[in-house]
Regions:
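Bacterial N-terminal signal peptides
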Residues: 5-16
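SH3-family beta-barrel domains
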Residues: 19-35, 45-49, 54-97, 104-132, ...
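Short, small/polar residue-rich loop motifs at catalytic or cofactor-binding pockets
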Residues: 39-40, 101-102
Length: 143
């Protein structure tokens, strides 16, 4: 009886789980986002370093993805890496000197600015922009 209970538990565990989507980020200074898998497809928009994406599928050397706004596009796999990044999702975000609202604001950024994750402390993320600016941001302000 214990074996059947255990087997049932294992089957439920492995068949009901949701697969985690692979998350990547842009590694080049600027990357073209295209409408399909190839340079013959239209450029939809351009993104900068550390722009995070969620992989939907792969086709040869091309990756179909979704971004923080739900937009989909294609990017060549040579232009991405697995570094952990975030992007701001609020219109105005304070970047602080330390992990907490008791720390001074170093600068503010608008929605859609990508950052490399350097460290985490509870609900705070230490970030670095491609231009070298660093600071701390609350996790509720990023995707």
């Amino acid at each position: 009886m214990r074996f059947i209970s255990f087997l049932t538990f294992v089957i439920i565990l492995f068949t009901s789980g949701v697969a985690m989507a692979e998350r990547l980020s842009v590694s080049s200074k600027i990357a073209n986002i295209r409408s399909g898998p190839g340079t013959d497809h239209e450029i939809l928009w351009k993104v900068e370093s550390y722009y995070p994406i969620v992989v939907l599928k792969k086709s040869g050397a091309w990756i179909n993805f979704r971004d923080f706004e739900g937009d989909e596009g294609w990017i060549h796999r040579s232009l991405v890496h697995k570094k952990a990044t975030v992007i701001t999702i609020k219109n105005t975000c304070n970047v602080r000197k330390g992990p907490g609202t008791n720390h001074d604001v170093l600068f503010t950024v608008e929605k859609g600015i990508p950052f490399l994750i350097m460290d985490r402390q509870k609900n705070w993320i230490q970030i670095k922009h491609a231009d070298g600016d660093r600071g701390w941001i609350h996790k509720s302000l990023v995707w």
